């Protein structure tokens, strides 16, 4: 590339320097026809290395030249400029401290970073005939050598045909394109294999033996390409969805035994039980048999209706059954009669209601002084008199549990009538 010599005089940009630059820009004419070219040496440069933007076929009789970062010629993108008369270098806002400009217009960038990639524009100002300068604009794009990529995965051990996997090609590299390979072939696009907009991320839906890999990704730019090591997903056998069998879905409270069994049976799984969405705690009331696959409730209460679920697990994960809820039969409890007051006056209306906790709902009946009055929860007598005084009893019965209960109140009616 020939010897390079840096000019002895360097300056950071000043207002006076900006005015000079602006003056030069004001006299720009259409580009020169000189075949100026720019090449990067070395053509492939890694991050942290140095690169020289070497200028070929530089015209003679130059006034100076200006380097810009990007293709926009403004102060913000101004890196450095060289003025031939006086061998003066000026620096602009885009100067990072790592750029060195030489008298042959070549630009050295040291310790290259990702931020240095992209386009660079060289403006060459040639001496004119006294009326202005002739300028040429030449653009060059710098690319870093692509790093060797690696593939990261949201899950290297997916369940067969049930789980989605996200593969990502790392690192994210500016001004580069991404390619994917499966089984050494370019990636077929199907409903189960989809790429992100940038191609950097690959989505696999319902992984099967066919789509388990191996996968490779490639990062490519105009000067280099690098491919990752192959990655193959460890496809796990699909877990069968468990289900619960039970000896009695309608147990009687504090009387019947309920036995739950988690199916299917396998020595390769562990079994977990869930009650109301929470892991079933260890309790002396609850018995577990055959490695937790069978759950026994010796005497069910109304607070243990569920829902119950069982889960089968291997070392990679698990799957739960559909919920099962018990229909616990209970009651009737001791009934309650409303309202609680028992003193009335002749001419008032008597309204009494009876309620008892029971599943299924209890049957209700009323007696007055031991004589059957009616069936139902409510009793009403309009315009009562003293002859309605007596013992009012509400009886409740649950035919499913075979239990009965009753409650009575004494009603007293005075012969004083309301005005």
From Swiss-Prot:
PROSITE patterns: IG_LIKE. A motif (Cell attachment site) lies at residues 127-129. Glycans are attached at residues 61, 104, 111, 199, 209, 268, 303. GO terms for cellular component: extracellular region. It comes from the Eukaryota. GO terms for biological process: female pregnancy. Its main location: secreted. Residues 1-34 form the signal peptide. It is found in: Secreted. The keyword Ribosomal protein does not apply. Belongs to the immunoglobulin superfamily. CEA family. This is Pregnancy-specific beta-1-glycoprotein 7. It comes from Homo sapiens. The gene is PSG7.
């Amino acid at each position: 590339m020939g010897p390079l010599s840096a000019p002895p005089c360097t300056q950071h940009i000043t207002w006076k320097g900006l005015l000079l630059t602006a003056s030069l820009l004001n006299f720009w004419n259409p580009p020169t026809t000189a075949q100026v070219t720019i090449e990067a040496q070395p053509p492939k440069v890694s991050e942290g290395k140095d690169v020289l933007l070497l200028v070929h076929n530089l015209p003679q009789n130059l006034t100076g030249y200006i380097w810009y970062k990007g293709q926009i010629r403004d102060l913000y993108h101004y890196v450095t400029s060289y003025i031939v008369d006086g061998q003066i270098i000026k620096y602009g806002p885009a100067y990072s401290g790592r750029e060195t400009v030489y008298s042959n217009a070549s630009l050295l960038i040291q310790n290259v970073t990702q931020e240095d990639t992209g386009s660079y524009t060289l403006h060459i100002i040639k001496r004119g005939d006294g009326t202005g300068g002739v300028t040429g604009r030449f653009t060059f794009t710098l690319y870093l050598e692509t790093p060797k990529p690696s593939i990261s995965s949201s899950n290297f051990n997916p369940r067969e045909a049930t789980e989605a996997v996200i593969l990502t090609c790392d690192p994210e590299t500016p001004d580069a394109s991404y390619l994917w390979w499966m089984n050494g072939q370019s990636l077929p696009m199907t409903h189960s294999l989809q790429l992100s907009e940038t191609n950097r991320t690959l989505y696999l839906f319902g992984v099967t033996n066919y789509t388990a890999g191996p996968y490779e990704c490639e990062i490519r730019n105009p000067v280099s390409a690098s491919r990752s090591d192959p990655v193959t997903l460890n496809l796990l056998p699909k877990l069968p969805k468990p289900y619960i069998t039970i000896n009695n879905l309608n147990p009687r409270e504090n009387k019947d035994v309920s036995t739950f069994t988690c199916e299917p049976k396998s020595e390769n799984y562990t079994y977990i039980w869930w009650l109301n969405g929470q892991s079933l705690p260890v309790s002396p009331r609850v018995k577990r048999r055959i490695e937790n696959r069978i759950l026994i409730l010796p005497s069910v209460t109304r607070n243990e209706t569920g829902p119950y679920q069982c889960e089968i697990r291997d070392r990679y994960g698990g799957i739960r059954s559909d919920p099962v809820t018990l229909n616990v039969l209970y009651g009737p409890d001791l009934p309650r009669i409303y309202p609680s007051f028992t003193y009335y006056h002749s001419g008032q209306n008597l309204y009494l209601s009876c309620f008892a906790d029971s599943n299924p709902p209890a049957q209700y009946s009323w007696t007055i002084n031991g004589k059957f009055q009616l069936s139902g929860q409510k009793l009403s007598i309009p315009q009562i008199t003293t002859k309605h005084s007596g013992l009012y009893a509400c009886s409740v019965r649950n035919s499913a549990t075979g239990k009965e209960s009753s409650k009575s109140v004494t009603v007293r009616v005075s012969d004083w009538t309301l005005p």
